[in-house]
Amino acid sequence: MSKTPLTEAVAAADSQGRFLSSTELQVAFGRFRQAASGLAAAKALANNADSLVNGAANAVYSKFPYTTSTPGNNFASTPEGKAKCARDIGYYLRIVTYALVAGGTGPIDEYLLAGLDEINKTFDLAPSWYVEALKYIKANHGLSGDSRDEANSYIDYLINALS
């Protein structure tokens, strides 16, 4: 079993032969509220993924117009290049939803950031493109309240890692 604050609290209470304290139970309820917000945010982002990805790609093209005029496999000067750009932005968004469901940065760290520098150098991709895409998604996802805060925390984490 993986260790989390909840499993550690249960293990400590069990080793001491006691029930969970009211403080430990409050922490558990807080984690469940956070999880509910994360799940709601992941669902909303997934439901709006196409429009968010397309809008984010257009934001990248607007800020970095050379991406649509430079020929080559790694640029958006062709329909295939634009499709690759959208695919990559969609991958970043998908990983954010995984983090929201998992309740931690593990999916971002393991599935995206590990080895990302090597991939970007190999394929001549600029992290600033994805930072711009993530900023667009953050500004336009339409979430509010705790769901917004949960989503933004992972988007910000990823932006900071790319910056």
Curated annotation (Swiss-Prot):
Gene Ontology BP annotations: photosynthesis
Database matches in SUPFAM superfamilies: Globin-like (SSF46458)
Modification after translation, per record? Contains one covalently linked phycocyanobilin chromophore.
Q: Which UniProt keywords apply?
A: Antenna complex, Bile pigment, Chromophore, Electron transport, Membrane, Photosynthesis, Phycobilisome, Thylakoid, Transport
Membrane topology annotation = Peripheral membrane protein
Q: Which domain of life is it from?
A: Bacteria
Q: Relate the protein's function as given in its record.
A: Light-harvesting photosynthetic bile pigment-protein from the phycobiliprotein complex (phycobilisome, PBS). Phycocyanin is the major phycobiliprotein in the PBS rod.
Under which name does UniProt file this protein? C-phycocyanin alpha subunit
Q: Which organism is it from?
A: Synechococcus elongatus (strain ATCC 33912 / PCC 7942 / FACHB-805) (Anacystis nidulans R2)
